[in-house]
């Protein structure tokens, strides 16, 4: 679609929506920003645009008569596709795009795209480093922090875009086609948005929707859903595994990550050379290395980059040691599966801070993973009573309830012995007490340093 002169509704007045509106204006379209919040501060929204134009801003009830004037709708990631208003767009025959689709349509060059329940940000950051070390023009975008829409007009045919893509963004893609895609894993998450696990899986798998036989999809062999999915898709499938050798793919053999192609078996790196902890991070390295290899990067360059890579903030991030107690920030552990990986990475008796916003998750597997390693479970947030009840039902009773994160850090410092670890890995979203998981992690680090 040629966007020039088109009237485009941007649904959502947050960071993503404003970024999409800025891009649309730069591409010659006429963006209209809409938000369902009747009390929206329109002046504040205007101040957040790039300042080169003055978009129309609609707030509150949607003016139904305006439907006929629209050519396209761009949904922000936080807008559910099952809203009656969104359904009316489809019924009217309007194209409905995600911001990812908009950025892809206006960008150039190759796209390497990563999705999955957990590990996306670390894998995206690592792949971004590998590609950045090997290529001239590389953009690392998406949920990792830089909006895809803010960079697409800077891209050339020689550019490489490394994109972290969420399930929310995949719901409304149309032509989005990565040269290399990866689905790292699929575990229970966002059921408050997708309602069923089957729907969540379907949306994640859309990342391969437009890939052809010359494209590549990297999948986790140890995820049964993904292993079966890989049997019936168009792109070339490359599996990774941390538990077994593969006939073809990338896998962990003892402490050595190996890549096996149709022609040869290539050592990539030893796990002891890596600066990031845990088996889940070995899987992230395998996924990023496979993607880079099939994007044309040499093994030598991949090896150098992965050895230099350090953990991104809020992912089992070492904060400090005080009185013999090590403090780790894993605020990105926003669901039980991610939080399990945080516990698995600990090699000390652990005081675990958990709880937060309820995404309708089950916490049983997370609690069962404590396996003698967790000394105390210190709970905060909306889910603290729900998690306490689940833990007691499963026989774990060393539980302390706190009003907030500051109190939880203080209690952990009082209870911890030299040689212990204090781990913030909440298994829940941050909403309600914090704006996002980054703010939660930053506050944890502040409270720890103030002890």
Please provide the spans of the model-predicted regions.
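Short internal beta-strands
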Residues: 31-37, 217-221, 353-354, 373-382
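Beta-strand->loop->alpha-helix junctions that form or flank phosphate-binding loops
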Residues: 60-61, 97-101, 234-252, 303-307, ...
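C-terminal helical cap/extension that packs against the catalytic core
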Residues: 43-55, 364-420
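N-terminal leader/targeting and accessory segments in enzymes
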Residues: 1-98, 102
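Walker A (P-loop) phosphate-binding motif
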Residues: 99-141
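Flexible active-site lid/hinge loop adjacent to a nucleotide/diphosphate
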Residues: 155-246, 251-253, 258, 265, ...
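Residue-level signal for inorganic ion chemistry
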Residues: 12, 24, 73, 114, ...
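Nucleotide phosphate-binding/pyrophosphate-handling subdomain across enzymes
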Residues: 2-7, 17-27, 271-374
